[in-house]
């Protein structure tokens, strides 16, 4: 934003970038990552395939699933993309042999649906009409996902930080190339169809408002660093104790658990870590 509104010149950006490059060249990826975790800096390594396969974080999270093939070989495959509380995703099975299910498929020529097909009803109502969502996500990945739910008719109230601007508000394009946090094309695209308000969650009064919104909501979405919600007293265990029917999804760079869980970051940093 400082570059866009003229408070800093592009030459200053280039100067700082060169200085950072010189400094980073004296450090290893591991050293930079450890320092970033200690100082809460947005720095992540660009990993190799070997580093991904041997990732301590992915191993801790149980990401790899070992599948035994028909010839007896065992191979690790990427597992489920998320951890579900009550409905875990199905484990991977062995790949079928060529033609293994041909006869079985051919014998099911008159298969009927497991769920009876109802008479088609024409309606202008969107499928998620009536679903109420409290959106505590920020940046791009989370708000883009909840934007899809808004497109399908969900009623969404998005809460932003009252003391720290969402970084996406600083991104181009802007109308007439005039920087304005309320007019970022990317931000408004990600959050179309939602209602919004700003709260300072460090204040008890703001947490009271969040609880009112939780009582209203069917679904809670959040993308803070792990433990942040619990520190505010609004983590899943605390919410579920008062409202056991709540559906909650938490998203962060490295997952909610593990030795690297506290590493913060954006989507481009996830791409770097993924190799």
Regions found by a protein language model. Give the residues of each.
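Short, composition-biased local secondary-structure segments
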Residues: 1-8, 71-73, 116-118
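Aromatic-enriched alpha-helical interface/lid elements that frame and gate functional surfaces
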Residues: 1-39, 43
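Active-site loop of classical SDR/Rossmann-like NAD(P)-dependent oxidoreductases
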Residues: 7-11, 78, 94-97
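A short alpha-helix capping/helix-coil boundary motif
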Residues: 10-13, 81-85, 123-126, 188-190
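Short, surface-exposed connector motifs at secondary-structure boundaries
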Residues: 15, 85-88, 216-222
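Short, well-ordered beta-strand elements within core beta-sheets of diverse protein domains
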Residues: 17-27, 43-44, 91, 134-137, ...
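N-terminal helix-loop segment corresponding to the beta1-alpha1 unit
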Residues: 30, 68, 93, 97, ...
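A glycine-rich dinucleotide-binding beta-alpha-beta segment and adjacent secondary-structure elements
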Residues: 38-92
């Amino acid at each position: 934003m400082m570059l866009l509104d003229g408070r800093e010149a592009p030459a200053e950006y280039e100067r700082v970038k060169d200085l950072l490059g010189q400094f980073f060249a004296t450090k290893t990826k591991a050293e930079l990552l450890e320092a970033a975790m200690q100082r809460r800096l947005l720095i992540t390594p660009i990993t190799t395939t070997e580093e991904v396969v041997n990732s301590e974080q992915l191993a801790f999270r149980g990401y790899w699933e070992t599948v035994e093939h028909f010839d007896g070989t065992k191979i690790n495959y990427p597992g489920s993309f998320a951890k579900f509380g009550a409905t875990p995703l199905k484990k991977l099975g062995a790949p079928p042999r060529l033609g293994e299910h041909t006869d079985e498929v051919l014998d099911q020529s008159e298969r009927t649906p497991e769920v009876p097909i109802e008479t088609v009803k024409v309606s202008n109502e969107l499928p998620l009409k009536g679903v109420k969502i409290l959106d505590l996500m920020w940046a791009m990945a989370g708000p883009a996902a909840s934007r899809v739910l808004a497109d399908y008719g969900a009623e969404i109230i998005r809460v932003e930080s009252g003391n720290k601007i969402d970084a996406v508000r600083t991104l181009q394009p802007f109308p007439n190339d005039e920087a304005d946090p309320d007019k970022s094309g990317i931000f408004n695209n990600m959050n179309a169809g939602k209602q919004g308000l700003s709260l300072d969650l460090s204040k008890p009064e703001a947490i009271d408002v969040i609880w009112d919104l939780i009582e209203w909501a069917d679904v809670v979405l959040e993308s803070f660093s792990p433990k942040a919600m619990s520190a505010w007293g609004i983590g899943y265990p605390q919410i579920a104790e008062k409202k056991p029917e709540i559906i909650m999804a938490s998203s962060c760079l490295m997952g909610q658990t593990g030795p690297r869980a506290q590493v913060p970051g954006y989507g481009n940093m996830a791409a770097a870590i993924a190799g």
